[in-house]
Amino acid sequence: MPKTPVLMDHDGAVDDYLAALLLLTMDHVEPLGIIVTPADCYIQPAVSITRKMLDLIGRSTVPVAESTVRGINPFPQLYRRDSLVIDCFPILNEQDEIKTPLLPESGQDFMVRVLREAIEPVTLLITGPLTTLAVALDAAPDIEAKIQQLVWMGGALNVRGNVAIDLEPGQDGSAEWNAYWDAEAIDRVWQTQIPIVMCPLDITNNVPVTPGFIRKLAKQRRYPLSDLAGQCYSLVIPQDYYFWDVLATAYLGQPEFFQLREWETAIVTKGRSQGRTKLEAGGRKIQALDSVDIDRFYAYILQQWAK
């Protein structure tokens, strides 16, 4: 059975690495590479973590590229510093050298090259802002035809966003962070005909990382993937934390767990609501993950990380 070609673009937060770990456990997926966008991270440790992680799981042939794009509204340093901590985890630093290659070209140029060279249309899995894709589309509009679908963790349709007003007083609380980082990039992608599957806060708010899940993960820490995932989640125990990027990635592995719903949408690019993914009659049609079989999802993640 032919494998599904997938190019991943993540932005270096805790759940981005775990989403990559999940993707690479999927036997039906052919990973074409991983791009790291400098958003919810410090880019050098985020790239380092990605490469060390690939070494850990024996996938050092998967190339990594560093995007050099910039957003409009930076993530708080409080969020981004997790990348500095994870890069020092002992489990990622047993070896003296990193084998996984870091490509000399930028992430946006790598995206263009991969799509142009692809024999069949490629699925893009993006778990951060869409800026790298937007820049790639501006540089090479022809790549749009090579994209099978975009699976994106981002946006909030019928719920409030997660940009806290105390951290961003210029925002009204309606935006989700991946959209708020660069609303103009989201709007650029919305102008295309690329089929979009959103994993918005509407569904992720219902899928928390629970103490019960953490306990089950701890009981299988003899597996390197579970050990690394457990250490990553230990960084976020004091806060409410959800399966954002991991949930979006799980859709590629087990789409039958999910119900999708079509919405007509538009992107607010200016003012206090910038980054809002709003419903608008006659707007851009997208598919959104609407509900998930939570018990089957939790069981699937534990199964995939028992390696």
Where are the regions that the model predicts?
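Active-site histidine-anchored catalytic micro-motif
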Residues: 2-51, 96-198, 204
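Metal-dependent C-N hydrolase catalytic cores
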Residues: 2-4, 47-117, 284-292, 302-306
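A broad structural signal for alpha-helix termini and local helix breaks/kinks
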Residues: 57-58, 140, 253
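Short, surface-exposed amphipathic charged segments that create phosphate/polyanion-binding patches used
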Residues: 78-84, 164-167, 214-215
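Short, mixed-charge aromatic SLiMs
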Residues: 41-45, 73, 156-160, 266-282
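Short C-terminal domain-edge/linker segments immediately following a structured domain
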Residues: 38-39, 63-68, 94-99, 155-157, ...
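Conformational coupling and interaction surfaces
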Residues: 1-3, 19-31, 177-180, 184, ...
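Short secondary-structure transition/capping segments
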Residues: 44-45, 77, 209-213
